[in-house]
Curated annotation (Swiss-Prot):
Native source organism of the sequence: Pasteurella multocida (strain Pm70)
Listed pathway(s): Amino-acid biosynthesis; L-arginine biosynthesis; N(2)-acetyl-L-ornithine from L-glutamate: step 2/4
Keywords: Amino-acid biosynthesis, Arginine biosynthesis, ATP-binding, Cytoplasm, Kinase, Nucleotide-binding, Transferase
The enzyme's E.C. designation: 2.7.2.8
Protein name: Acetylglutamate kinase
Protein family (similarity comment): Belongs to the acetylglutamate kinase family. ArgB subfamily.
The reaction(s) this protein catalyses: N-acetyl-L-glutamate + ATP = N-acetyl-L-glutamyl 5-phosphate + ADP
Cellular location(s): Cytoplasm
MF terms in GO: acetylglutamate kinase activity; ATP binding
Length: 257
């Protein structure tokens, strides 16, 4: 089976019961299926909490966190440290053989600064799959934070959706984006199992897809186009459905290129 990349949204990291449910589902899945799994995560809520504790301002531009050079060490500590090791600890509890990584380890990706006004924020492209392939071949569970390093050796913060897309492209994997939404809903609040780019454009125009959902759907559409395959948006709140999702069933909305 193709590997599966699971992108985890930040709110999950703030919800211990949800994390427990997720890793229970992953453990059940791995007992019954022989499919390599990779987790890619952000952790915006953990970054925000840490910044608040340190009385540092949180500034965003077009939905992306502005990361000046005096903040990148704190953000790296939050994402590659607290968030990553929290997930590794949960996975270890369920005997899932986790290995905590960032996007720079083993030259997995190549990072380029996105916009000088955003500071230490980058986009990444796939580079070298050897480390991941070796880990997956030995039945490890890689858990990858969205911290990268550019060619100058500078730490960079990467949007977790974009990071997950690059990792999925790197190892030719399927991609599932887990967050706190059931998928895309129509005007009658009914879940839409599948959508393509033209349908998404129309739903945004009709104000059916609004606010934060626009960002989620566009990220999934970008990923679907780059990977040339469907990308699922699904909710982590239903542990009983997650095993089916990991096996390829649609429980949320599949965004098609």
């Amino acid at each position: 089976m193709k590997p599966l990349v699971i992108k985890l949204g930040g709110v999950l990291l703030d919800t211990p019961a949800a994390m427990e449910n997720l890793f229970t589902a992953l453990a059940n899945y791995q007992q019954n299926f022989d499919r390599p799994l990779v987790i890619v995560h952000g952790g915006g809520c953990i970054v925000d909490e840490l910044m608040q504790r340190l009385h540092l301002p949180v500034q965003k531009k077009n939905g992306l966190r502005v990361t000046p050079s005096d903040h990148i060490e704190i953000i790296t500590g939050a994402l590659a440290g607290i968030a990553n090791k929290t997930l590794v600890a949960q996975a270890a509890k369920f005997h899932l053989n986790p290995v905590g990584l960032c996007l720079a380890d083993g030259n997995l990706t190549y990072a380029t600064q996105l916009d000088p006004e955003l500071g230490h924020v980058a986009t990444v492209v796939p580079k070298n799959p050897a480390l991941l392939n070796n880990l997956l071949g030995e039945a490890f569970l890689p858990i990858i934070s969205s911290i990268a390093v550019d060619k100058q050796g500078l730490l960079m913060n990467v949007n977790a959706d974009q990071a997950a897309t690059a990792i999925a492209a790197l190892i030719q994997a399927d991609l599932v984006m887990l967050s706190d939404v059931d998928g895309v809903l129509d005007a009658n609040k009914q879940r839409l199992p599948e959508l393509n780019g033209a349908q998404i454009e129309q739903l945004i125009k009709d104000n059916v897809i609004t606010d934060g959902m626009v960002v989620k759907v566009n990220a999934a559409l970008d990923a679907a186009k780059m990977l040339n395959q469907g990308v699922d948006i699904a909710n982590w709140k239903y542990p009983e459905k997650l095993t089916a999702l990991f096996a390829g069933e649609i429980i949320g909305t599949r965004i098609k290129p």
